[in-house]
Swiss-Prot record:
Cysteine pairings via disulfide bonds: none
NCBIfam families per record: efp (TIGR00038), PRK00529.1 (NF001810)
Organism: Prochlorococcus marinus (strain MIT 9301)
Gene: efp
Name of protein: Elongation factor P
Membership in a protein family: Belongs to the elongation factor P family.
Amino acid sequence: MISSNDFRTGTTIELDGQVWRVVEFLHVKPGKGSAFVRTKLKSVQNGNVVEKTFRAGESVQQAILEKSNLQHTYVESGDYVFMDMTSFEETRLSSEQIGKGAKYLKEGMEVNVIFHNGKVLEVELPISITLKVTETDPGVKGDTASGGTKPAILETGAQVMVPLFISVGEMIRVDTRNDSYLGREN
């Protein structure tokens, strides 16, 4: 159990049979009446965001999460196979369980998988990854860094918008949170 006074950004709690992560919290102490904690909670399972108010000092069930560092080894019949780097056990996850990050997975990539009661809740990819551009429109002389953008398809099949000067075969860094181009990789 955790007190609502101990909420911090990132704290995970169990509420109504779901696991929620505290995104924002604010301790409010009105002049009249008792203090309370106003929170914004995000469901770890489906990403829904709700606002909920707790009485100050109210006890809430804290969610116990296990984080494992797994390495993506291969894809078999639509399932992504991961190997635990310490116990060498294999874990199979569907693209629905992985979420939008599935388009960035390549063999040998390490990810953090978060479990709750033996079930996969979330797959955390590295914030930025380096991938090779396999398909894009050719660059034209005079394209500059401050100009426009064009679509590019990466080695994993993901599509991102890149500057006009990027060409096929280049290695680029991509932000996996918002699918944005971060820069060239040397």
